Amino acid sequence: MTSATIPGLDTAPTNHQGLLSWVQEVAELTQPDRVVFADGSDEEFNRLAAELVEAGTLKKLNEKKHPNSYLALSDPSDVARVESRTYICTEEESGAGPTNNWMDPTEMRSIMTDLYRGCMRGRTMWVVPFCMGPLGVEDPKLGVEITDSEYVVISMKVMTRMGKAALEKMGDDGFFVKALHSVGAPLEPGQKDVPWPCNDTKYITHFPETREIWSYGSGYGGNALLGKKCYSLRIASAMAHDEGWLAEHMLILKLISPENKAYYFAAAFPSACGKTNLAMLQPTIPGWRAETLGDDIAWMRFGKDGRLYAVNPEFGFFGVAPGTNWKSNPNAMRTIEAGNTVFTNVALTDDNDVWWEGLEGQPEHLIDWKGNDWYAGKTETPAAHPNSRYCTPMSQCPILAPEWDDPQGVPISGILFGARRKTTVPLVTQARDWQHGVFMGATMGSEQTAAAEGKVGTVRRDPMAMLPFLGYHVGDYFQHWIDLGKNSDESKLPKVFFVNWFRRGDDGGFLWPGFGENSRVLKWIVDRIEHKAGGQDTPIGIVPKAEDLDLDGLDVSVDDVAKALAVNPDEWREELPQIEEWFEFVGEKLPTGVRDEFEALKQRLSEAG
């Protein structure tokens, strides 16, 4: 088929010639049955959802329990981000750095063009315009995803500001990131479709220099919703490096003191370290309140007043379901209960409700994420996939901060780095200054989770929780952080802290209860920012004593809190060779400033006896 004979190409609702010529070029390559520009309307969402129910991709859930909500079960081979098939294709291999897979851009384009040839046959090609962040900003970060997946279209409506308004924002010549996606499953005439089309061959490719994303073979979240990690972190981190800002894997939290003073925090945690739970915190200490602005991504720029301001580029939550419950995260549960949610790979109850491991009230019988019968106490495999998800609108969150859609963003008082560590790392540590904070973030290590491929439980370095999401060389990224600090007024920079909710005692149990009780740690952090709280200088930074924390009403022994806060120089000396090994991996682009902090740490540990 030529472009002249592909229905929909001649009725595009835009005069943007750059967009139109790209859409035509992709249509001629991929050969869809028709082209449709998504408008982002509720009517479109409902129509597509109904079609996906008819096709067997979605199941409509119990309207009383989850209004306008659906469950999708993926192909068992397509359940998570595929880091082994994720590429950063810079002109020079050194541009991608040692943390990324690299291929020559010309070679990659050739391979993927062959894969794309005819790949949308028998399908509809959707043109999905979207905006990352509030539509009202001076310099909106726009994108267009071309996809052959209706699941992607409805998910993009939840996760981004998608459709007509974003297309209008582009005008006739506005810049946009080109994001091309196909499940790689063409249909021959008369061929029956499968509920979850995908391909064994997968590529999730980024071209940072030309701001393009090409994805093939996967229908799953992070590989297919290209506004998510692909744009808002991998491409945006390269943009941020070039333009002098930060695109980070961070939640944004607003904490309000009993005096009604607001503090805003950005916090970076690797997957499954409690990021969403902290973003939707319910403080347990009287008089303190929390509101959320985002649970996954923060874009931060310096304002005219010299402070660092953050916006959340996303429009929805794409959270891990297992472990989410009325105790760990009641606000996530309330957000989901409000409806308009697409669940993926959770279990289905007999009354068309959803269930996952960790959720209260385990039923006797379920249909598991593979579509099989599951019986409590008898079936040995999990009912929900460990990386199963809910995709739900942010606007439904009961503790959403009113500033969530403010183009100016919010001024950040503190940056938190965190990780999942059983030993060594205290409950909370304050960095001595910005550069020391960069060192803390650069050397983060966390135990592996189910959100990515790899062995669960092993510790891997995950700098600023950005290891899988950097769009350029990790050493240049560290230098970018240091430079932003050097070029700023230090008195206006956010204070930097490191937290670890997951330290364990000798009996293997958690020393700190976590969840809402983490507000006690945040209170100490606020008091440090206000120069009100005590803390002891240790070789690794400033750490509170147990009595420096507000422990009123906490059902944990002071002894356990002290153990959670302990700094053991011997354990930290064991950490040093691992950090050295990580720095060798980063290579010659490791900034001098980060190396200096490491040498200073070694010196302080040697003096600690």
From Swiss-Prot:
Keyword annotations of the record: Cytoplasm, Decarboxylase, Gluconeogenesis, GTP-binding, Lyase, Manganese, Metal-binding, Nucleotide-binding
Reaction equations catalysed: oxaloacetate + GTP = phosphoenolpyruvate + GDP + CO2
Major localization listed first in the record, in broad terms: cytoplasm
Cofactor, how bound (note): Binds 1 Mn(2+) ion per subunit.
Sites where the protein binds Mn(2+): 229, 249, 296
Residue numbers annotated as active site: 273
EC numbers: 4.1.1.32
Positions that bind GTP: 272-277, 389, 420, 515-518
Entries under InterPro entries matching the protein: PEP_carboxykin_GTP_CS, PEP_carboxykinase_C, PEP_carboxykinase_GTP, PEP_carboxykinase_GTP_C, PEP_carboxykinase_GTP_N, PEP_carboxykinase_N
Residues engaged in binding substrate: 81, 220-222, 271, 387-389
SUPFAM superfamilies: PEP carboxykinase N-terminal domain, PEP carboxykinase-like
Compartments (UniProt record): Cytoplasm
Cofactor: Mn(2+)
EC supergroup of this enzyme: lyase
Gene Ontology molecular function terms on file: GTP binding; manganese ion binding; phosphoenolpyruvate carboxykinase (GTP) activity
A Pfam match: PEPCK_N
Single biological process term from Gene Ontology: cellular response to glucose stimulus
Gene Ontology CC entries for this record: cytosol
Pathway entry: Carbohydrate biosynthesis; gluconeogenesis
Disulfide bonds: none
Family of the protein in this entry: Belongs to the phosphoenolpyruvate carboxykinase [GTP] family.
Family matches, as PANTHER family: PHOSPHOENOLPYRUVATE CARBOXYKINASE (PTHR11561), PHOSPHOENOLPYRUVATE CARBOXYKINASE [GTP]-RELATED (PTHR11561:SF0)
Subunit structure: Monomer.
Entry function: Catalyzes the conversion of oxaloacetate (OAA) to phosphoenolpyruvate (PEP), the rate-limiting step in the metabolic pathway that produces glucose from lactate and other precursors derived from the citric acid cycle.
Name assigned to this protein: Phosphoenolpyruvate carboxykinase [GTP]
Source organism (scientific name): Mycolicibacterium paratuberculosis (strain ATCC BAA-968 / K-10)
